[in-house]
Protein backbone atom coordinates (compact mmCIF):
# COMPACT_ATOMS: atom_id res chain seq x y z
CA UNK A 1 0.00 0.00 0.00
CA UNK A 2 2.89 2.37 0.82
CA UNK A 3 4.43 1.82 -2.63
CA UNK A 4 1.09 2.43 -4.35
CA UNK A 5 0.64 5.66 -2.41
CA UNK A 6 4.18 6.78 -3.30
CA UNK A 7 3.56 5.90 -6.94
CA UNK A 8 0.35 7.93 -6.93
CA UNK A 9 2.09 10.90 -5.33
CA UNK A 10 4.92 10.64 -7.87
CA UNK A 11 2.51 10.57 -10.80
CA UNK A 12 0.56 13.53 -9.38
CA UNK A 13 3.81 15.51 -9.01
CA UNK A 14 4.85 14.68 -12.56
CA UNK A 15 1.44 15.71 -13.94
CA UNK A 16 1.54 18.95 -11.96
CA UNK A 17 4.99 19.79 -13.33
CA UNK A 18 3.94 19.13 -16.91
CA UNK A 19 0.69 21.11 -16.61
CA UNK A 20 2.37 24.10 -14.98
CA UNK A 21 5.02 24.52 -17.66
CA UNK A 22 4.00 28.08 -18.49
CA UNK A 23 4.34 29.18 -14.87
CA UNK A 24 7.78 27.65 -14.59
CA UNK A 25 8.87 29.27 -17.82
CA UNK A 26 7.73 32.73 -16.68
CA UNK A 27 8.99 32.58 -13.09
CA UNK A 28 12.21 30.56 -13.41
CA UNK A 29 15.24 32.42 -12.11
CA UNK A 30 18.23 32.91 -14.40
CA UNK A 31 20.64 29.98 -14.41
CA UNK A 32 23.63 30.76 -12.15
CA UNK A 33 27.04 30.86 -13.73
CA UNK A 34 28.79 27.51 -13.74
CA UNK A 35 32.30 27.05 -12.32
CA UNK A 36 34.97 26.91 -15.05
CA UNK A 37 35.58 23.54 -16.64
CA UNK A 38 38.98 21.85 -16.63
CA UNK A 39 39.53 22.98 -20.22
CA UNK A 40 38.62 26.59 -19.35
CA UNK A 41 41.05 26.57 -16.41
CA UNK A 42 43.85 25.46 -18.73
CA UNK A 43 43.01 28.26 -21.18
CA UNK A 44 42.99 30.82 -18.33
CA UNK A 45 46.50 29.77 -17.31
CA UNK A 46 47.64 30.18 -20.92
CA UNK A 47 46.35 33.76 -21.00
CA UNK A 48 48.26 34.59 -17.82
CA UNK A 49 51.49 33.29 -19.32
CA UNK A 50 50.94 35.25 -22.58
CA UNK A 51 52.11 32.22 -24.55
CA UNK A 52 50.25 29.25 -26.00
CA UNK A 53 51.05 26.01 -24.22
CA UNK A 54 52.01 22.74 -25.86
CA UNK A 55 48.59 21.54 -24.63
CA UNK A 56 46.79 24.12 -26.79
CA UNK A 57 49.20 23.81 -29.69
CA UNK A 58 48.52 20.08 -29.91
CA UNK A 59 44.76 20.63 -29.59
CA UNK A 60 44.29 18.54 -26.44
CA UNK A 61 40.98 18.71 -24.55
CA UNK A 62 40.30 17.42 -21.04
CA UNK A 63 36.97 16.80 -19.32
CA UNK A 64 35.26 14.44 -16.90
CA UNK A 65 32.54 13.98 -14.32
CA UNK A 66 31.68 12.54 -10.90
CA UNK A 67 28.54 10.44 -10.41
CA UNK A 68 27.18 9.40 -7.00
CA UNK A 69 23.72 8.13 -6.08
CA UNK A 70 21.51 6.54 -3.43
CA UNK A 71 18.97 3.85 -4.32
CA UNK A 72 16.24 2.55 -2.00
CA UNK A 73 14.55 -0.79 -2.71
CA UNK A 74 11.02 -1.03 -1.26
CA UNK A 75 11.22 -4.85 -1.37
CA UNK A 76 14.11 -4.81 1.13
CA UNK A 77 15.83 -7.83 -0.50
CA UNK A 78 17.81 -10.03 1.86
CA UNK A 79 20.80 -9.95 -0.49
CA UNK A 80 20.94 -6.12 -0.41
CA UNK A 81 20.95 -6.20 -4.22
CA UNK A 82 18.52 -4.83 -6.78
CA UNK A 83 17.69 -7.81 -8.97
CA UNK A 84 18.48 -7.49 -12.71
CA UNK A 85 19.80 -3.94 -12.36
CA UNK A 86 23.17 -3.24 -13.94
CA UNK A 87 24.90 -0.24 -12.36
CA UNK A 88 22.46 0.72 -9.57
CA UNK A 89 22.91 -2.70 -7.99
CA UNK A 90 23.14 -2.01 -4.25
CA UNK A 91 19.78 -1.80 -2.46
CA UNK A 92 19.21 0.98 0.08
CA UNK A 93 22.79 2.15 -0.25
CA UNK A 94 24.94 5.04 -1.41
CA UNK A 95 27.16 4.19 -4.39
CA UNK A 96 30.16 6.10 -5.83
CA UNK A 97 29.23 5.10 -9.36
CA UNK A 98 31.82 6.76 -11.52
CA UNK A 99 34.69 9.22 -11.62
CA UNK A 100 35.67 9.65 -15.24
CA UNK A 101 38.57 11.52 -16.80
CA UNK A 102 38.75 11.96 -20.56
CA UNK A 103 41.68 13.27 -22.58
CA UNK A 104 41.19 13.67 -26.31
CA UNK A 105 42.39 15.38 -29.43
CA UNK A 106 39.53 15.39 -31.94
CA UNK A 107 40.60 14.90 -35.54
CA UNK A 108 39.97 17.94 -37.78
CA UNK A 109 38.80 17.10 -41.32
CA UNK A 110 39.57 20.62 -42.56
CA UNK A 111 43.05 20.79 -41.04
CA UNK A 112 46.53 19.78 -42.10
CA UNK A 113 47.72 16.18 -42.29
CA UNK A 114 48.81 16.35 -38.65
CA UNK A 115 45.52 17.94 -37.57
CA UNK A 116 43.59 15.11 -39.21
CA UNK A 117 44.98 12.75 -36.55
CA UNK A 118 43.37 12.42 -33.13
CA UNK A 119 42.72 10.14 -30.18
CA UNK A 120 40.51 9.60 -27.13
CA UNK A 121 41.36 8.07 -23.75
CA UNK A 122 38.38 7.76 -21.38
CA UNK A 123 39.27 6.26 -17.97
CA UNK A 124 36.64 5.15 -15.43
CA UNK A 125 36.99 4.71 -11.67
CA UNK A 126 34.28 3.49 -9.29
CA UNK A 127 31.70 0.77 -8.83
CA UNK A 128 30.42 1.02 -12.41
CA UNK A 129 33.88 0.16 -13.72
CA UNK A 130 33.48 -3.35 -12.29
CA UNK A 131 30.69 -3.84 -14.81
CA UNK A 132 32.13 -1.90 -17.75
CA UNK A 133 35.34 -3.93 -17.76
CA UNK A 134 35.50 -5.90 -20.98
CA UNK A 135 33.56 -9.13 -20.59
CA UNK A 136 33.79 -12.23 -22.73
CA UNK A 137 30.46 -13.67 -23.80
CA UNK A 138 28.74 -12.00 -20.83
CA UNK A 139 29.97 -14.56 -18.33
CA UNK A 140 30.45 -13.32 -14.72
CA UNK A 141 34.03 -12.67 -13.68
CA UNK A 142 35.77 -12.89 -10.34
CA UNK A 143 37.89 -9.71 -10.34
CA UNK A 144 36.71 -6.65 -8.44
CA UNK A 145 38.86 -3.99 -10.11
CA UNK A 146 37.23 -0.57 -10.06
CA UNK A 147 39.21 0.91 -12.95
CA UNK A 148 38.53 0.51 -16.66
CA UNK A 149 39.40 2.25 -19.91
CA UNK A 150 35.93 2.73 -21.32
CA UNK A 151 37.41 4.03 -24.58
CA UNK A 152 40.97 4.06 -25.87
CA UNK A 153 41.39 4.67 -29.59
CA UNK A 154 43.24 6.60 -32.27
CA UNK A 155 41.57 8.18 -35.29
CA UNK A 156 42.49 9.73 -38.60
CA UNK A 157 40.36 11.47 -41.24
CA UNK A 158 41.45 10.52 -44.73
CA UNK A 159 41.07 13.27 -47.39
CA UNK A 160 38.48 11.28 -49.34
CA UNK A 161 35.38 13.20 -50.39
CA UNK A 162 33.93 14.83 -47.29
CA UNK A 163 36.47 13.00 -45.13
CA UNK A 164 36.60 9.29 -44.24
CA UNK A 165 37.12 8.85 -40.50
CA UNK A 166 39.14 5.79 -39.46
CA UNK A 167 39.13 4.74 -35.79
CA UNK A 168 41.19 1.94 -34.25
CA UNK A 169 40.97 0.72 -30.65
CA UNK A 170 38.32 0.26 -27.96
CA UNK A 171 35.15 2.31 -28.50
CA UNK A 172 31.58 2.59 -27.27
CA UNK A 173 29.29 0.27 -29.20
CA UNK A 174 27.20 1.35 -32.18
CA UNK A 175 24.30 -0.70 -30.80
CA UNK A 176 21.47 0.88 -28.84
CA UNK A 177 20.21 4.26 -27.64
CA UNK A 178 21.48 4.21 -24.06
CA UNK A 179 25.17 4.42 -23.14
CA UNK A 180 27.43 3.74 -20.17
CA UNK A 181 27.62 7.34 -18.91
CA UNK A 182 24.45 8.04 -16.95
CA UNK A 183 24.27 11.80 -17.61
CA UNK A 184 24.09 11.13 -21.37
CA UNK A 185 20.88 9.11 -20.87
CA UNK A 186 17.43 10.54 -20.06
CA UNK A 187 17.17 8.51 -16.84
CA UNK A 188 19.45 7.46 -13.99
CA UNK A 189 19.03 3.68 -14.28
CA UNK A 190 19.45 1.72 -17.52
CA UNK A 191 16.98 -0.45 -19.38
CA UNK A 192 17.06 -4.24 -19.30
CA UNK A 193 17.50 -4.02 -23.06
CA UNK A 194 20.76 -2.07 -22.78
CA UNK A 195 22.14 -3.68 -19.66
CA UNK A 196 21.31 -7.30 -20.45
CA UNK A 197 20.74 -7.45 -24.19
CA UNK A 198 23.31 -5.18 -25.86
CA UNK A 199 27.06 -4.69 -26.05
CA UNK A 200 28.75 -1.92 -24.05
CA UNK A 201 31.98 -1.56 -26.03
CA UNK A 202 33.76 -3.06 -29.03
CA UNK A 203 37.45 -3.26 -29.94
CA UNK A 204 38.60 -3.14 -33.54
CA UNK A 205 38.51 -1.01 -36.69
CA UNK A 206 35.70 1.43 -37.59
CA UNK A 207 35.06 3.61 -40.66
CA UNK A 208 32.63 6.57 -40.73
CA UNK A 209 31.58 8.79 -43.61
CA UNK A 210 29.14 11.73 -43.74
CA UNK A 211 27.63 11.89 -47.22
CA UNK A 212 25.71 15.09 -46.45
CA UNK A 213 24.06 16.72 -43.41
CA UNK A 214 21.26 14.14 -43.63
CA UNK A 215 23.16 10.84 -44.03
CA UNK A 216 26.07 9.34 -42.07
CA UNK A 217 27.18 5.71 -42.32
CA UNK A 218 29.52 3.74 -40.04
CA UNK A 219 30.85 0.19 -40.41
CA UNK A 220 33.33 -1.75 -38.32
CA UNK A 221 35.14 -5.06 -37.86
CA UNK A 222 35.63 -5.88 -34.17
CA UNK A 223 36.65 -8.68 -31.81
CA UNK A 224 33.08 -9.01 -30.61
CA UNK A 225 30.85 -7.78 -27.81
CA UNK A 226 32.91 -6.30 -24.94
CA UNK A 227 35.99 -8.27 -26.00
CA UNK A 228 39.38 -6.59 -25.74
CA UNK A 229 40.98 -10.00 -26.21
CA UNK A 230 39.13 -11.97 -28.86
CA UNK A 231 37.55 -15.17 -27.54
CA UNK A 232 37.53 -16.94 -30.91
CA UNK A 233 39.09 -16.71 -34.38
CA UNK A 234 36.07 -15.03 -35.94
CA UNK A 235 35.29 -11.32 -36.19
CA UNK A 236 32.03 -9.41 -35.75
CA UNK A 237 30.74 -6.95 -38.36
CA UNK A 238 28.90 -3.87 -37.03
CA UNK A 239 27.08 -1.02 -38.76
CA UNK A 240 25.09 2.15 -38.17
CA UNK A 241 23.22 4.35 -40.64
CA UNK A 242 22.00 7.69 -39.23
CA UNK A 243 19.39 9.68 -41.18
CA UNK A 244 18.19 13.21 -40.40
CA UNK A 245 15.64 14.04 -43.11
CA UNK A 246 14.12 16.85 -41.02
CA UNK A 247 15.27 18.96 -38.07
CA UNK A 248 12.45 17.42 -35.99
CA UNK A 249 12.96 13.79 -37.00
CA UNK A 250 15.88 11.38 -37.03
CA UNK A 251 16.22 7.65 -37.65
CA UNK A 252 19.22 5.43 -36.98
CA UNK A 253 19.50 1.79 -38.01
CA UNK A 254 22.15 -0.37 -36.36
CA UNK A 255 23.21 -3.98 -36.14
CA UNK A 256 25.96 -6.55 -35.79
CA UNK A 257 26.58 -10.11 -36.91
CA UNK A 258 29.34 -12.52 -35.99
CA UNK A 259 30.47 -15.34 -33.67
CA UNK A 260 30.50 -14.33 -29.99
CA UNK A 261 31.00 -17.65 -28.19
CA UNK A 262 34.37 -18.97 -27.10
CA UNK A 263 35.61 -22.54 -27.31
CA UNK A 264 35.10 -23.03 -23.58
CA UNK A 265 32.96 -21.21 -21.02
CA UNK A 266 33.67 -22.15 -17.44
CA UNK A 267 33.02 -25.87 -17.09
CA UNK A 268 31.21 -26.14 -20.43
CA UNK A 269 33.10 -28.30 -22.91
CA UNK A 270 33.98 -27.01 -26.35
CA UNK A 271 30.97 -27.21 -28.63
CA UNK A 272 28.52 -27.31 -25.73
CA UNK A 273 25.73 -24.82 -25.13
CA UNK A 274 27.23 -21.33 -25.20
CA UNK A 275 30.65 -22.61 -26.24
CA UNK A 276 30.57 -22.99 -30.03
CA UNK A 277 33.04 -20.61 -31.66
CA UNK A 278 31.19 -20.80 -34.98
CA UNK A 279 27.73 -19.94 -33.58
CA UNK A 280 26.52 -16.62 -34.98
CA UNK A 281 24.84 -13.80 -33.06
CA UNK A 282 22.71 -11.43 -35.16
CA UNK A 283 21.34 -8.12 -33.88
CA UNK A 284 19.27 -5.42 -35.56
CA UNK A 285 17.55 -2.35 -34.17
CA UNK A 286 16.64 1.26 -34.78
CA UNK A 287 16.38 4.55 -32.90
CA UNK A 288 13.54 6.86 -33.95
CA UNK A 289 13.62 10.41 -32.58
CA UNK A 290 10.71 12.86 -32.85
CA UNK A 291 11.02 16.48 -31.71
CA UNK A 292 7.28 16.98 -31.15
CA UNK A 293 7.66 20.53 -29.80
CA UNK A 294 10.52 22.78 -28.75
CA UNK A 295 10.22 21.20 -25.28
CA UNK A 296 9.10 17.63 -25.99
CA UNK A 297 11.14 14.78 -27.47
CA UNK A 298 9.95 11.21 -28.11
CA UNK A 299 12.37 8.33 -28.70
CA UNK A 300 11.45 4.79 -29.76
CA UNK A 301 13.88 1.87 -29.96
CA UNK A 302 12.73 -1.51 -31.34
CA UNK A 303 15.37 -4.23 -30.97
CA UNK A 304 15.84 -7.88 -32.00
CA UNK A 305 18.64 -10.41 -31.39
CA UNK A 306 19.12 -14.09 -32.17
CA UNK A 307 22.05 -16.39 -31.38
CA UNK A 308 22.74 -19.99 -32.34
CA UNK A 309 23.58 -22.58 -29.67
CA UNK A 310 22.63 -20.26 -26.82
CA UNK A 311 19.20 -21.43 -25.59
CA UNK A 312 19.24 -22.40 -21.90
CA UNK A 313 15.60 -23.45 -21.54
CA UNK A 314 15.19 -27.04 -20.35
CA UNK A 315 14.77 -29.36 -23.30
CA UNK A 316 15.94 -26.72 -25.79
CA UNK A 317 19.62 -26.57 -24.91
CA UNK A 318 21.82 -25.85 -27.89
CA UNK A 319 19.07 -24.34 -30.01
CA UNK A 320 18.78 -20.70 -31.06
CA UNK A 321 18.10 -18.14 -28.35
CA UNK A 322 16.09 -15.01 -29.07
CA UNK A 323 15.89 -11.78 -27.09
CA UNK A 324 14.06 -8.65 -28.20
CA UNK A 325 12.52 -5.52 -26.81
CA UNK A 326 10.99 -2.10 -27.27
CA UNK A 327 11.96 1.05 -25.40
CA UNK A 328 9.99 4.31 -25.39
CA UNK A 329 11.06 7.66 -23.90
CA UNK A 330 9.31 11.00 -23.38
CA UNK A 331 11.51 13.96 -22.44
CA UNK A 332 9.78 17.19 -21.43
CA UNK A 333 12.11 20.16 -20.86
CA UNK A 334 10.21 22.51 -18.59
CA UNK A 335 12.91 25.17 -18.81
CA UNK A 336 16.70 25.35 -18.87
CA UNK A 337 16.93 23.80 -15.41
CA UNK A 338 13.95 21.46 -14.94
CA UNK A 339 13.13 18.40 -17.03
CA UNK A 340 10.71 15.48 -16.61
CA UNK A 341 11.36 12.12 -18.26
CA UNK A 342 9.22 8.99 -18.59
CA UNK A 343 10.49 5.64 -19.87
CA UNK A 344 8.64 2.44 -20.68
CA UNK A 345 10.23 -0.83 -21.76
CA UNK A 346 9.40 -4.44 -22.53
CA UNK A 347 12.23 -6.97 -22.85
CA UNK A 348 11.74 -10.65 -23.73
CA UNK A 349 14.47 -13.20 -23.09
CA UNK A 350 12.84 -16.17 -24.81
CA UNK A 351 15.86 -18.45 -24.54
CA UNK A 352 17.01 -17.54 -21.04
CA UNK A 353 20.37 -16.54 -22.50
CA UNK A 354 20.61 -12.99 -21.14
CA UNK A 355 18.80 -12.69 -17.80
CA UNK A 356 19.71 -14.10 -14.38
CA UNK A 357 23.11 -15.36 -15.55
CA UNK A 358 24.91 -13.57 -12.72
CA UNK A 359 24.02 -15.25 -9.42
CA UNK A 360 21.01 -16.53 -7.52
CA UNK A 361 19.64 -16.31 -4.00
CA UNK A 362 17.35 -18.64 -2.09
CA UNK A 363 17.07 -21.04 0.81
CA UNK A 364 18.88 -23.71 -1.22
CA UNK A 365 22.30 -22.93 -2.63
CA UNK A 366 22.61 -19.57 -0.90
CA UNK A 367 23.92 -16.47 -2.62
CA UNK A 368 27.09 -16.69 -4.66
CA UNK A 369 27.63 -13.06 -5.63
CA UNK A 370 29.19 -11.39 -8.65
CA UNK A 371 31.43 -8.29 -8.77
CA UNK A 372 29.06 -5.36 -9.04
CA UNK A 373 26.03 -7.52 -8.27
CA UNK A 374 24.66 -7.21 -11.81
CA UNK A 375 22.15 -9.58 -13.42
CA UNK A 376 21.19 -11.33 -10.16
CA UNK A 377 17.87 -13.09 -9.53
CA UNK A 378 15.96 -15.02 -6.90
CA UNK A 379 16.39 -18.79 -7.20
CA UNK A 380 13.58 -20.69 -8.94
CA UNK A 381 11.62 -23.76 -7.72
CA UNK A 382 12.91 -27.13 -8.90
CA UNK A 383 10.81 -30.15 -9.69
CA UNK A 384 11.46 -31.70 -6.27
CA UNK A 385 10.36 -28.65 -4.30
CA UNK A 386 13.79 -27.16 -3.72
CA UNK A 387 15.29 -24.04 -5.25
CA UNK A 388 17.76 -23.89 -8.10
CA UNK A 389 19.24 -21.07 -10.14
CA UNK A 390 21.96 -19.93 -12.49
CA UNK A 391 22.16 -20.55 -16.19
CA UNK A 392 19.55 -17.95 -17.07
CA UNK A 393 15.75 -17.83 -16.85
CA UNK A 394 13.42 -17.42 -19.85
CA UNK A 395 11.11 -14.51 -19.03
CA UNK A 396 9.52 -11.24 -20.12
CA UNK A 397 10.41 -8.07 -18.21
CA UNK A 398 8.71 -4.66 -18.00
CA UNK A 399 10.21 -1.42 -16.71
CA UNK A 400 8.40 1.88 -16.07
CA UNK A 401 10.57 4.77 -14.91
CA UNK A 402 9.79 8.37 -13.91
CA UNK A 403 12.71 10.80 -13.59
CA UNK A 404 12.76 14.44 -12.52
CA UNK A 405 15.96 16.31 -13.37
CA UNK A 406 17.11 19.66 -11.97
CA UNK A 407 20.27 21.51 -13.07
CA UNK A 408 21.01 24.35 -10.63
CA UNK A 409 24.23 24.93 -12.61
CA UNK A 410 25.21 23.87 -16.13
CA UNK A 411 27.88 21.66 -14.56
CA UNK A 412 25.65 20.19 -11.82
CA UNK A 413 22.89 17.65 -12.52
CA UNK A 414 20.54 16.27 -9.86
CA UNK A 415 17.91 13.58 -10.42
CA UNK A 416 15.13 11.84 -8.53
CA UNK A 417 13.84 8.61 -10.06
CA UNK A 418 11.10 6.09 -9.30
CA UNK A 419 11.28 2.76 -11.14
CA UNK A 420 8.86 -0.16 -11.24
CA UNK A 421 10.10 -3.54 -12.55
CA UNK A 422 7.89 -6.54 -13.31
CA UNK A 423 8.45 -10.04 -14.70
CA UNK A 424 6.23 -12.96 -15.66
CA UNK A 425 8.50 -15.04 -13.38
CA UNK A 426 9.20 -14.49 -9.69
CA UNK A 427 12.83 -13.45 -10.16
CA UNK A 428 12.88 -10.56 -7.66
CA UNK A 429 13.29 -10.77 -3.90
CA UNK A 430 10.89 -9.34 -1.32
CA UNK A 431 12.85 -9.89 1.85
CA UNK A 432 13.62 -13.61 1.62
CA UNK A 433 10.61 -14.41 -0.56
CA UNK A 434 10.36 -14.53 -4.33
CA UNK A 435 8.35 -11.80 -6.06
CA UNK A 436 7.40 -10.86 -9.62
CA UNK A 437 7.98 -7.12 -9.10
CA UNK A 438 10.42 -4.61 -7.64
CA UNK A 439 10.22 -0.88 -6.89
CA UNK A 440 13.19 1.43 -6.38
CA UNK A 441 13.61 5.13 -5.58
CA UNK A 442 16.92 6.79 -6.48
CA UNK A 443 18.60 10.15 -5.99
CA UNK A 444 21.61 11.08 -8.13
CA UNK A 445 24.13 13.92 -8.24
CA UNK A 446 26.51 14.45 -11.19
CA UNK A 447 29.23 17.08 -11.39
CA UNK A 448 30.73 17.82 -14.81
CA UNK A 449 34.20 19.31 -15.17
What residue spans do the PLM features occupy?
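Residues on the lipid-exposed face of transmembrane beta-strands in outer-membrane beta-barrel proteins
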Residues: 64, 96-105, 151-156, 168, ...
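Surface-exposed coil loops of outer-membrane beta-barrel proteins
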Residues: 77-91, 128-246, 252-273, 361-382
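N-terminal periplasmic/intermembrane-space "pro-region" immediately following the signal or transit peptide
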Residues: 2-86, 372-387, 449
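Transmembrane beta-strands of outer-membrane beta-barrel proteins
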Residues: 60-68, 115-121, 164-166, 217-219, ...
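Glycine- and aromatic-enriched membrane insertion/assembly motifs of diderm outer-membrane
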Residues: 82-127, 331-333
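Short loop/turn motifs that connect adjacent beta-strands in outer-membrane beta-barrel proteins
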Residues: 51-62, 107-117, 159-164, 214, ...
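Outer-membrane beta-barrel pore domains and translocons
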Residues: 67-71, 122-126, 169-173, 220-225, ...
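Outer-membrane beta-barrel pore domains
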Residues: 85-88, 129-132, 138-142, 249-449
